[in-house]
Amino acid sequence: MANVALLGCTGMVGSHILTHLLGNSSVARIDTISRRTPQPATAAPQEKLTTFVSDDSSKWASQLSSLTPTPDIFISAFGTTRGAAGGFENQYKIEHGLNVEMARAARDAGTKVYVLISSTGADKNSSFGYPRMKGEIEEEVKAMGFDRTIILRPGLISGERQESRPAEAVMRGFAGLVGKIHSGLKDGWAQDADVIAKAAVNAGVKALNGEVPAGSEKVWVMYGKDIIQYGKGQ
């Protein structure tokens, strides 16, 4: 039975991750750290869910470090947008800074498996800010030396977002339409948030049990086809 900590539990993918963790019989305890109370905790008491809610993100790492029992798996689906942050510089400080800080706190606490929801095209050498930020987060996390590091690189994430992203909403709508015709037409470039979430949970639990693909014993990077496999077929 796994103890899991989750960062980003109120976002598009993270909320689905929480739902799958709650429904997974291999998960004994879930700790979430967030600015807002996740919906499952507001709907009804959840026996295996403990929430820490604070607007002061400087307290998050110490909260993670103090969790008892220590999480076996730490999952980060945390991210923000340029608009919400007030520009890319602030987005970088928040998204890169908190992801790296929380990963380090998890490692130092003794967490064995780290799971990151990243993005297709993540590249620390990119000339574009967003993929460069994602790539830098990946590289810094990999260097921390968790027993297992899992990085999911989904394409366009389809589903319903709470915040407004008009251009992305058009593409999500198109992905949904194409997916209704045949799922294979969109699986290569867009994945449903729920499918990504299930893949993250399944991969994390399998990695904790030592069930990883050959050659991915330390770092397992999951692309679209892998996400579909573990999010739909497992």
Curated annotation (Swiss-Prot):
Gene3D superfamilies: NAD(P)-binding Rossmann-like Domain. The keyword Mitochondrion applies. It is found in: Mitochondrion outer membrane. It comes from the Eukaryota. Coiled coil: none annotated. SUPFAM superfamilies: NAD(P)-binding Rossmann-fold domains. The keyword Transit peptide applies. Keywords: Membrane, Mitochondrion, Mitochondrion outer membrane, Transit peptide. GO terms for cellular component: mitochondrial outer membrane. GO terms for biological process: import into nucleus. Residues 1-36 form a transit peptide. It is a peripheral membrane protein. Belongs to the FMP52 family. This is Protein fmp52, mitochondrial. It comes from Aspergillus niger (strain ATCC MYA-4892 / CBS 513.88 / FGSC A1513).
